[in-house]
């Protein structure tokens, strides 16, 4: 069932699917008071599956999520033009990837 929920602690507003007990499950989007936003898959109240997160500072991550963290493969684009495409583990670059900076310099390899 699709619902609108508001977190009393963070002030975030969620619009999307929940199970019978109100747990975020399936597709949904959540917006935080600072402007951060996540759209994608949820499981057990956590970002889990494919999704995209827009940070309040303009950075964007799109890719795989597990337990509310970037885990798997994804693209992180910094507001300043730098980006990283590759493997992630617990919100950190981990494994094989390509990082490109705003000045055009690049690194491809292991993190």
Please identify what each model-predicted range represents.
Residues 1-111:
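Intrinsically disordered, low-complexity repeat tracts enriched in Gly/Pro/Ser/Thr and acidic residues
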């Amino acid at each position: 069932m699709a619902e609108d929920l508001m977190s009393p602690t963070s002030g975030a507003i969620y619009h999307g699917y929940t199970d019978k007990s109100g747990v975020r499950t399936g597709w949904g989007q959540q917006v935080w008071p600072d402007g951060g936003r996540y759209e994608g898959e949820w499981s057990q109240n956590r970002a889990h599956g494919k999704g995209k997160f827009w940070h309040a500072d303009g950075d964007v991550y799109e890719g795989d999520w597990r337990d509310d963290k970037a885990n798997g493969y994804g693209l992180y684009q910094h507001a300043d033009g730098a980006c990283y495409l590759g493997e992630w583990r617990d919100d950190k670059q981990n494994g094989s990837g390509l990082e490109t900076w705003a000045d055009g310099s690049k690194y491809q390899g292991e993190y």
